[in-house]
Amino acid sequence: MYRRVTTVSQSLRDALTRLPKVELHVHLEGTMLSDTLLELAHKNGIAAQPPSYSYENLTGFLDVFWFVQSVLRTREDWAMLAYESVLQAASNGVVYNEVFFTPARHMRGGMALGDIVAGIDDGLSAGEHETGTTTRLIYDIDREFGPAAAVEQMEILLDLRCRNTQGVGRVIGIGMDSTERNVDPATFATAYAMASKAGLHRTAHQGEDSPAAAIRVALEVLGCERIDHGITILDDPALTKVAVDRQIALTVCPSANVRINPDRCPALSEHPFPKMREAGLLATLNTDDPALTELSLGLEYTNVANAYGYEWKSMVQIASDGVTASWLDGDDKHRIHGLIDAADAAINGALA
């Protein structure tokens, strides 16, 4: 079982939690607290599993994730989840989020995408008003449903954009997740081309449980601007150089990889994150599914600082790189870089 790392000083742990941060790889459904799961399951007449979120590998994790999705039945359910996700993020120093949501199963069950997005917007707006933490959305294609379903979903999403449906303006990009094994990313090229033509950003989960060749396909065929996970990229030195030269961001989730996929990453000490950074890759730090992995971004910064011996300045640089890798415009990036610089100046002196 994965254990939390708690050997860095308490003052540094507190400072890392307060440090202004952005998160680029977090799944909205993966922020659902166990109490919320039980509440929504009871409300919707669903027999809930024990709230421990127990699983042993990626396959087991996906089963848990899909069960979490199953308790989201109404616009109000999505709003509740989104609101709580903002509060959790803000309590860990997150000032800006780019959050995945994966609606394919709900749409297959008859829920309208417009209602899902509007519900998420309701919750995010309330959370933003309360905390100041802002969120944009990434429409997440579920590979399990296949390329044709992805095209259909893009058609629906783009129609909502044309009609300026509530909340759809928050959707700034598309991504793709679920099982990576034996799935050719190139088969989703049509959906990605539709998104690109509409001006949406593109990313994809690759290189968590797939080889570096799949990362190359995501970049060259799908036109991805970022890669989520991407931890196998170092297996291909030529591709690594391309990513370094183009400063293609990789949204890495070290502790989540250890917790969810221990067969590939049995311990943080064996995770390639530090080697990715040393190679010059724009590797950012994220939680993936914080409630389901008993994480927070503040804790993840602590875990990484401890595991790899990173001092305060190294962690500040990681936070800054997250801003650089975001899909914010230049003015907003400048503003958040300023928040990080101000926190560095204030906190570094206290740590000295």
Where are these regions (language model features)?
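Metal-cofactor-binding active-site regions of metalloenzymes
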Residues: Y2-L200, D209-A214, V221-R226, T232-A249, ...
